[in-house]
Amino acid sequence: MIESELATSRWSLMLEADIATQTTRSLTNELSFIVAGLRPSTKESVLHFLELIFINLKYQSKKWLYSLVICKSLIALLGRKRLSANVRKIVRFLNVIICVIGLWKGLSAMSGKNTFINGLQSYLISETALPELGSFQELSTSSLGSFRMFQQIAVGFVDALFCTRIPASLWIKYKEYTTSAETTVPQECGLCMMCVQRGDERVAITTPYTTDCGHTYCYACIMSRLKLVNNVSCPICKHRIRFALPDQTMG
Protein backbone atom coordinates (compact mmCIF):
# COMPACT_ATOMS: atom_id res chain seq x y z
CA MET A 1 0.00 0.00 0.00
CA ILE A 2 2.77 2.43 0.95
CA GLU A 3 4.81 1.58 -2.17
CA SER A 4 1.72 2.10 -4.33
CA GLU A 5 1.11 5.53 -2.79
CA LEU A 6 4.77 6.50 -3.31
CA ALA A 7 4.65 5.40 -6.94
CA THR A 8 1.43 7.33 -7.55
CA SER A 9 2.89 10.40 -5.86
CA ARG A 10 6.07 10.19 -7.94
CA TRP A 11 4.16 9.92 -11.22
CA SER A 12 2.06 12.91 -10.13
CA LEU A 13 5.20 14.98 -9.54
CA MET A 14 6.62 13.97 -12.90
CA LEU A 15 3.40 14.96 -14.63
CA GLU A 16 3.34 18.28 -12.76
CA ALA A 17 6.87 19.01 -13.97
CA ASP A 18 5.83 18.02 -17.48
CA ILE A 19 2.88 20.40 -17.33
CA ALA A 20 5.26 23.24 -16.44
CA THR A 21 7.62 22.28 -19.27
CA GLN A 22 4.86 21.99 -21.88
CA THR A 23 3.26 25.24 -20.74
CA THR A 24 6.59 27.03 -21.09
CA ARG A 25 7.03 25.51 -24.54
CA SER A 26 3.57 26.61 -25.67
CA LEU A 27 4.23 30.14 -24.40
CA THR A 28 7.54 30.16 -26.28
CA ASN A 29 5.71 29.11 -29.45
CA GLU A 30 3.25 31.96 -29.00
CA LEU A 31 6.12 34.41 -28.44
CA SER A 32 7.78 33.10 -31.61
CA PHE A 33 4.72 34.20 -33.60
CA ILE A 34 4.84 37.62 -31.97
CA VAL A 35 8.50 38.21 -32.88
CA ALA A 36 8.26 36.45 -36.27
CA GLY A 37 8.86 39.70 -38.13
CA LEU A 38 12.25 40.27 -36.53
CA ARG A 39 15.58 39.20 -37.99
CA PRO A 40 16.66 35.67 -36.90
CA SER A 41 19.50 36.93 -34.70
CA THR A 42 17.29 39.57 -33.06
CA LYS A 43 14.45 37.09 -32.54
CA GLU A 44 16.79 34.62 -30.85
CA SER A 45 18.13 37.35 -28.58
CA VAL A 46 14.59 38.37 -27.56
CA LEU A 47 13.66 34.77 -26.74
CA HIS A 48 16.85 34.33 -24.73
CA PHE A 49 16.08 37.43 -22.67
CA LEU A 50 12.54 36.18 -22.06
CA GLU A 51 14.09 32.93 -20.85
CA LEU A 52 16.30 34.93 -18.49
CA ILE A 53 13.26 36.71 -17.06
CA PHE A 54 11.43 33.41 -16.57
CA ILE A 55 14.35 31.79 -14.76
CA ASN A 56 14.93 34.87 -12.62
CA LEU A 57 11.30 34.84 -11.49
CA LYS A 58 10.86 31.10 -10.99
CA TYR A 59 14.32 29.94 -9.94
CA GLN A 60 15.93 32.80 -8.05
CA SER A 61 17.82 30.36 -5.83
CA LYS A 62 19.29 28.57 -8.86
CA LYS A 63 21.95 31.11 -9.80
CA TRP A 64 23.85 28.55 -11.87
CA LEU A 65 20.83 28.24 -14.21
CA TYR A 66 20.75 32.00 -14.64
CA SER A 67 24.48 32.08 -15.41
CA LEU A 68 24.20 29.25 -17.92
CA VAL A 69 21.49 30.97 -19.94
CA ILE A 70 23.47 34.23 -19.95
CA CYS A 71 26.51 32.39 -21.31
CA LYS A 72 24.40 30.58 -23.90
CA SER A 73 22.88 33.91 -24.97
CA LEU A 74 26.31 35.46 -25.45
CA ILE A 75 27.58 32.44 -27.36
CA ALA A 76 24.49 32.45 -29.58
CA LEU A 77 25.12 36.11 -30.41
CA LEU A 78 28.82 35.46 -31.10
CA GLY A 79 27.91 32.54 -33.32
CA ARG A 80 25.87 34.88 -35.57
CA LYS A 81 28.80 37.18 -36.30
CA ARG A 82 31.55 36.65 -38.84
CA LEU A 83 34.37 35.29 -36.73
CA SER A 84 37.70 33.79 -37.64
CA ALA A 85 38.09 30.00 -37.66
CA ASN A 86 40.11 30.03 -34.42
CA VAL A 87 37.53 32.15 -32.60
CA ARG A 88 34.72 29.86 -33.79
CA LYS A 89 36.63 26.88 -32.38
CA ILE A 90 36.93 28.66 -29.03
CA VAL A 91 33.19 29.47 -29.05
CA ARG A 92 32.32 25.83 -29.78
CA PHE A 93 34.66 24.67 -27.01
CA LEU A 94 33.08 27.09 -24.52
CA ASN A 95 29.63 25.88 -25.54
CA VAL A 96 30.63 22.29 -24.77
CA ILE A 97 32.11 23.33 -21.41
CA ILE A 98 28.91 25.17 -20.49
CA CYS A 99 26.76 22.15 -21.38
CA VAL A 100 29.01 19.85 -19.35
CA ILE A 101 28.80 22.19 -16.34
CA GLY A 102 25.03 22.30 -16.76
CA LEU A 103 24.90 18.51 -16.90
CA TRP A 104 26.91 18.13 -13.70
CA LYS A 105 24.93 20.83 -11.89
CA GLY A 106 21.65 19.37 -13.03
CA LEU A 107 22.54 15.92 -11.78
CA SER A 108 23.69 17.25 -8.43
CA ALA A 109 20.38 19.15 -8.09
CA MET A 110 18.33 15.99 -8.41
CA SER A 111 18.44 14.93 -4.80
CA GLY A 112 17.06 11.46 -4.24
CA LYS A 113 16.82 10.55 -7.91
CA ASN A 114 20.33 9.22 -8.55
CA THR A 115 19.58 5.69 -7.35
CA PHE A 116 16.52 5.50 -9.57
CA ILE A 117 18.48 6.83 -12.56
CA ASN A 118 21.18 4.21 -12.04
CA GLY A 119 18.55 1.49 -11.95
CA LEU A 120 16.87 2.88 -15.06
CA GLN A 121 20.15 3.08 -16.97
CA SER A 122 20.88 -0.52 -16.01
CA TYR A 123 17.49 -1.55 -17.34
CA LEU A 124 17.99 0.33 -20.62
CA ILE A 125 21.21 -1.61 -21.21
CA SER A 126 20.11 -5.08 -20.13
CA GLU A 127 16.27 -4.85 -20.11
CA THR A 128 16.27 -7.28 -17.20
CA ALA A 129 14.72 -5.43 -14.27
CA LEU A 130 12.78 -2.19 -14.38
CA PRO A 131 13.34 -0.33 -11.08
CA GLU A 132 10.33 0.09 -8.81
CA LEU A 133 9.40 3.75 -8.47
CA GLY A 134 8.10 3.37 -4.93
CA SER A 135 11.30 1.85 -3.57
CA PHE A 136 13.36 5.03 -3.85
CA GLN A 137 13.45 8.29 -1.93
CA GLU A 138 10.60 10.64 -2.72
CA LEU A 139 11.39 13.65 -4.91
CA SER A 140 10.50 17.23 -4.24
CA THR A 141 8.73 19.33 -6.86
CA SER A 142 11.59 21.84 -6.84
CA SER A 143 14.11 19.14 -7.75
CA LEU A 144 11.98 18.03 -10.68
CA GLY A 145 11.45 21.62 -11.75
CA SER A 146 15.20 22.29 -11.68
CA PHE A 147 15.87 19.17 -13.69
CA ARG A 148 13.25 20.06 -16.32
CA MET A 149 14.70 23.55 -16.75
CA PHE A 150 18.21 22.12 -16.95
CA GLN A 151 17.02 19.58 -19.54
CA GLN A 152 15.98 22.43 -21.84
CA ILE A 153 19.39 24.10 -21.49
CA ALA A 154 21.54 21.01 -22.15
CA VAL A 155 19.08 18.84 -24.01
CA GLY A 156 21.69 17.16 -26.19
CA PHE A 157 23.70 15.91 -23.23
CA VAL A 158 20.59 14.84 -21.36
CA ASP A 159 19.36 12.81 -24.33
CA ALA A 160 22.67 10.99 -24.53
CA LEU A 161 22.85 10.35 -20.78
CA PHE A 162 19.33 9.06 -20.32
CA CYS A 163 19.23 7.13 -23.61
CA THR A 164 16.26 9.00 -25.06
CA ARG A 165 15.64 6.14 -27.50
CA ILE A 166 14.00 4.11 -24.76
CA PRO A 167 13.20 0.51 -25.78
CA ALA A 168 9.58 -0.17 -26.62
CA SER A 169 9.38 -2.61 -23.71
CA LEU A 170 9.84 0.28 -21.25
CA TRP A 171 6.85 2.08 -22.71
CA ILE A 172 4.88 -1.17 -22.48
CA LYS A 173 5.69 -1.42 -18.77
CA TYR A 174 4.71 2.23 -18.35
CA LYS A 175 1.41 1.54 -20.11
CA GLU A 176 0.79 -1.48 -17.88
CA TYR A 177 1.14 0.80 -14.86
CA THR A 178 -1.02 3.64 -16.21
CA THR A 179 -3.72 1.28 -17.46
CA SER A 180 -4.46 0.34 -13.84
CA ALA A 181 -4.17 3.95 -12.61
CA GLU A 182 -7.01 6.43 -12.19
CA THR A 183 -5.93 8.37 -15.30
CA THR A 184 -7.07 5.58 -17.62
CA VAL A 185 -9.81 6.63 -20.03
CA PRO A 186 -12.47 3.92 -20.67
CA GLN A 187 -12.36 2.25 -24.08
CA GLU A 188 -15.63 3.82 -25.22
CA CYS A 189 -14.52 7.34 -24.22
CA GLY A 190 -11.40 7.62 -26.33
CA LEU A 191 -8.89 5.66 -28.37
CA CYS A 192 -5.23 6.51 -28.90
CA MET A 193 -4.62 6.39 -32.65
CA MET A 194 -0.87 6.12 -32.05
CA CYS A 195 -1.52 2.89 -30.13
CA VAL A 196 -3.77 1.71 -32.97
CA GLN A 197 -1.10 2.46 -35.57
CA ARG A 198 1.44 0.55 -33.52
CA GLY A 199 -0.88 -2.44 -33.26
CA ASP A 200 -1.04 -2.19 -29.47
CA GLU A 201 -3.96 -4.02 -27.89
CA ARG A 202 -4.17 -1.36 -25.17
CA VAL A 203 -5.79 1.36 -27.27
CA ALA A 204 -7.60 3.11 -24.38
CA ILE A 205 -5.94 6.47 -23.73
CA THR A 206 -3.82 6.47 -20.57
CA THR A 207 -2.73 9.78 -19.02
CA PRO A 208 -4.35 11.84 -21.83
CA TYR A 209 -2.34 14.65 -23.43
CA THR A 210 -3.96 16.95 -26.02
CA THR A 211 -1.89 18.38 -28.87
CA ASP A 212 -1.99 21.92 -30.24
CA CYS A 213 -4.20 20.62 -33.10
CA GLY A 214 -6.82 19.45 -30.59
CA HIS A 215 -6.42 15.66 -30.67
CA THR A 216 -5.67 13.52 -27.62
CA TYR A 217 -3.16 10.69 -27.21
CA CYS A 218 -1.46 8.74 -24.43
CA TYR A 219 1.29 10.61 -22.56
CA ALA A 220 3.85 7.91 -23.38
CA CYS A 221 2.92 7.83 -27.08
CA ILE A 222 2.95 11.55 -27.83
CA MET A 223 5.87 12.57 -25.60
CA SER A 224 8.14 9.80 -26.88
CA ARG A 225 7.48 10.88 -30.47
CA LEU A 226 8.05 14.56 -29.72
CA LYS A 227 11.43 13.68 -28.20
CA LEU A 228 12.53 11.27 -30.94
CA VAL A 229 11.11 12.76 -34.15
CA ASN A 230 11.79 16.24 -35.53
CA ASN A 231 8.49 16.66 -37.39
CA VAL A 232 5.62 14.80 -35.73
CA SER A 233 2.40 14.68 -37.75
CA CYS A 234 -0.99 14.10 -36.15
CA PRO A 235 -2.31 10.69 -37.28
CA ILE A 236 -5.84 12.15 -37.47
CA CYS A 237 -5.54 15.59 -39.11
CA LYS A 238 -1.95 15.32 -40.44
CA HIS A 239 -1.01 18.72 -38.98
CA ARG A 240 2.44 19.12 -37.44
CA ILE A 241 2.39 18.67 -33.67
CA ARG A 242 4.48 21.27 -31.83
CA PHE A 243 3.51 20.56 -28.22
CA ALA A 244 1.05 18.64 -26.05
CA LEU A 245 -0.58 19.52 -22.73
CA PRO A 246 -2.39 17.38 -20.14
CA ASP A 247 -6.09 17.01 -20.92
CA GLN A 248 -7.99 17.84 -17.74
CA THR A 249 -11.41 16.99 -19.24
CA MET A 250 -10.56 13.36 -20.03
CA GLY A 251 -8.46 12.60 -16.94
UniProtKB/Swiss-Prot annotation:
Cell compartment(s), UniProt: Cytoplasm
Matching Pfam families: zf-RING_UBOX
A GO term for molecular function: ubiquitin protein ligase activity
Keywords of this entry: Cytoplasm, Metal-binding, Zinc, Zinc-finger
Coiled coil regions, renumbered to chain: none
Chain ranges of zinc fingers (RING-type): 192-238
Listed GO CC annotations: cytoplasm
Principal place of residence: cytoplasm
Keyword Zinc assigned: yes
GO biological processes: ERAD pathway
PROSITE patterns: ZF_RING_1, ZF_RING_2
Keyword Glycoprotein tagged: no
Record protein name field: Uncharacterized RING finger protein C23A1.07
Taxonomic source organism: Schizosaccharomyces pombe (strain 972 / ATCC 24843) (Fission yeast)
